[in-house]
Amino acid sequence: MEFNFALITTELALFILGLATFVLGLLVPSHSRRGLGSFALLGLLLVLGITIINWSNQGVLLDGMYLVDQYATFFKILCLISAILVVLGSFRYIDKQVGNQFEYYSTVIFTTLGMVVMASAGDFITLYLGLELMTISFVILVAFRSFEAKSLEAGMKYILLAGLSSAVLLYGLSLVYGATGTILIGEVAREIADKGSTPLLIVGVVMLVAGLGFKISAVPFHMWSPDVYEGAPTPVTSFLAVGSKAASFAVLLRLFAGGFGGIQEQWTLLVAVLAALSMLIGNLVAIPQTNIKRMLAYSSIAQAGYIMVGLVSATEAGIKGVMFYAFLYVFATIGAFTVVAIVSNQTNSDEIRDYAGLIQRAPLAASVMLICLLSMAGIPPLAGFVGKFYLFKTVVENHMWLVYLGLIMSMVSVYYYLRVALVMFRDEPKESAPIHVGGAATITLVITMVATIILGIYPGPLAEVANMAAQSFLLK
């Protein structure tokens, strides 16, 4: 069978780009290495263009081990946009924080490669390889500020708990293989349709939920998030909050809506309970936080709960809702964390009280932070409102209690988001000196703000693309 390399141009381009960035970093003089950030950015933009051009290019490789469909391409585009915005927002922060910038940028690229492999994984081996490439790369990024104890502590916590979750996930995959006799996700679906469920299969599914629950920071597998988010470099935190979740939800949908769709009634309640706990605990624990990165960490736990609502239905509408909301979530989250990086770079603090009078010191940053926080709260007419509408609509008939809980928790989130807004807009600044934003960070802020507003007012094109991607789901 002839191998069609055209189907993996995104993966090949990312591998070459990551390798080239690293090798060039070793060859060029240290004073010239800052330009490698621009090189990585241009390369990622090129890869994004290639991926968009190949939107209609679909196929199956390696007898079903690698699936290239519009569903996978959608998540690849999402992960690439995340990487581009993170790199763009990293220039000033990374130049100040670390010396070997080329290692940072090449690791971001290889992290993205792991994510896109996960999006196309059609079997357990490919899934695990992509997951581990992403996880190991994130370990390097989280501990990148090795001269700071907090960053090293975050890296140590992440590698230990990530290793544990990977072990649980791998054991769950082995149990599913033992129950079905295949590692191909499509074949798993057919085996379940023919033979039904077994206790061994159910245990395997539960372990998969636990392993992937760590990656998306779902309760009760969320305990690592606040410490790691706080200790990691802020651009890495934003990438961890959006890229890791996007790739993990791509896998979750493949496995549960595709592979385990035949036993949906046996795992729906489990996922619904985890979604409810994530919304509840994430929002409630965010209220007393005084560190903005920890507050956003708990907020991201709640956001994972909202996205899991779409997984509960596991229908085409649910898949569309997950994809739509994940896309919106990228812009709001990266926009907020970019502001955090800008303020931290100037004040060396992540405390909410140090955002006092930000509207006077950095008007654009304060405005973008407000818009992103309101979007995450689901305030119309911003994008987050539309995304939550699509998600909650999928469970109205069978799980109305999730809709009520989601609406209540969204109102709770308004409290702690507006608390930050009041500090920025009402309180007087401790210092009058303006905060320098920088050209690259300004571009990131403008992109995230404009996308959050436009996708809320005019969501039709994105909804149509998400619908096309959901319909292309190859696992029948």
Swiss-Prot record:
InterPro entries: NADH-Q_OxRdtase_suN/2, ND/Mrp_TM. Its main location: membrane. It is a multi-pass membrane protein. One of its GO terms (cellular component) is plasma membrane. It is an enzyme of class 7 (translocase). It is found in: Cell membrane. Keywords: Cell membrane, Membrane, NAD, Quinone, Translocase, Transmembrane, Transmembrane helix, Transport. Its EC number is 7.1.1.-. It comes from the Bacteria. The chain crosses the membrane at residues 8-28, 35-55, 71-91, 102-122, 124-144, 159-179, 201-221, 239-259, 267-287, 295-315, 322-342, 366-386, 405-425, 437-457. Belongs to the complex I subunit 2 family. NDH-1 is composed of 14 different subunits. Subunits NuoA, H, J, K, L, M, N constitute the membrane sector of the complex. PANTHER family: NADH DEHYDROGENASE (PTHR22773). NDH-1 shuttles electrons from NADH, via FMN and iron-sulfur (Fe-S) centers, to quinones in the respiratory chain. The immediate electron acceptor for the enzyme in this species is believed to be a menaquinone. Couples the redox reaction to proton translocation (for every two electrons transferred, four hydrogen ions are translocated across the cytoplasmic membrane), and thus conserves the redox energy in a proton gradient. This is NADH-quinone oxidoreductase subunit N. It comes from Desulforamulus reducens (strain ATCC BAA-1160 / DSM 100696 / MI-1).
